[in-house]
Amino acid sequence: AARQTATLSRCFSEAAAPFVASNHPRRSVLYMPGSNARAMEKGKKLPADGLILDLEDAVAINMKETARKMVNEQVRKGGYGLREICIRINSLDTPWGEDDLRLVASSGCDAIALPKVERADQILKVDQIMRECGANPKTEIWSLIETPRGILNADEICGCLPRNACIIMGTSDLSKELNVHSRRALMTSLQLVILAAKKYNKVVLDGVYLDVKDLEGFEKECLEGKEFGFDGKTLIHPSTIDITNRVFAPSEQEVEDARNIIQCFHDAEKNGKGVVTYKGKLVENLHVVMAEKIMKQHELIEKI
């Protein structure tokens, strides 16, 4: 109980820190193996919003140290343009995690992804090490939630530190832990994390789709994820990037409607009208807020 109280106290004290999370679009975030130099080089030309250079699942045990050095050198070399670059380290509970973090924290990456997050104190420890290593104060932490304990502690995890800016669903590991095989069986878990992420205004990304040849099924899952409230999706193959970017971006019709709703509302305010309608539907302030969010997202996407 004492440890939990101290952890939550640290979270709330850090919440006042002047950290501003990135507003970069994260429709498509592609995992790339950190042991594959050719793949990481290819990532510089892919239309993904972000890349996760992976030191964890995608790297064999006998390649861990080599991959760590390769990723560090690759990120320091740069050349990724406006793409966000995140490095997924091994868990700090493994023999490689802390060495990963201490080497890449100051590499210039945009974020560090921490796997199998189950408690706020794991995030606090990463933050502490990043500070010790001279990481850029703007470098974010992205937390992967992929276990039952992580799901049930989602509120604590999402509420911990402004720097902990993005939540990623680890659906493959979660399916294994729950011994389930269908997307439907994960619905409660997904929605619990989405609720917690939205409560604290965090970006939340859906997990990967494993059948890379089933593009129809992939698009269906993207559409479903957007409907749930996910901001984007993590990917394992470049062939799925274009679909993801299209699904998680506002459509032309959505942009047009958003622009018109904002205009109608402001015109009504100027003319002293109390009731505003658009296409026969009542427009309230909440609709204007939603429309402004769509326009902001559209403008950010147009810049990349």
Which ranges hold each PLM region?
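Expand to "…catalyze enediolate/carbanion chemistry for C-C bond making/breaking, isomerization
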Residues: 1-304
